[in-house]
Amino acid sequence: MKRLFFIIGILVIGCSDFNPITSEDCDCGLEISSTLPYVNGSYELEYNQNLAQTYTMLDAATECGWSQHLQWDTNYQYRINTDWVSLINPASMTDEDGNAHVVFAAWEEFIGETVKVYCGYMDDHGHHFLDSLKIEVVDNE
């Protein structure tokens, strides 16, 4: 729940006009995507029944160069014993081209669910960026 408030906070702050730096000073951005099939506004992750989890890689493009720290989260978590586990790694760093990658993994219990993935960061000028996408976990085989 704390993560969700954090992400909403990034969105609210990122959309406000209180930052004195003009938008011309900022060449950065954020777009997250996947190579999964895109159907009706969501990416489709085909669950593999032969694995405990089915994995895919998500991509982020910032156009902001090396060493931007991106934070990731989802609107779902999975409980293992007493611990809540995210469906996505919580952080990644951009390469020299401003690109980053992160692993998303779903358990069988998520078949039929549409998971919303959030990614955000703040650039060197104090601008906040946030993007999201949806992944539907399906079992069509």
Where are these regions (language model features)?
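Sec-dependent N-terminal signal peptides
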Residues: 4-13
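Bacterial Sec-dependent N-terminal signal peptides
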Residues: 12-39
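Low-complexity "stalk/linker" and mucin-like segments enriched in Ser/Thr/Pro/Ala/Gly
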Residues: 29-45, 67-102
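Solvent-exposed, conformationally flexible loop/turn segments
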Residues: 40-55, 61
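C-terminal edge beta-strand
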Residues: 131-138
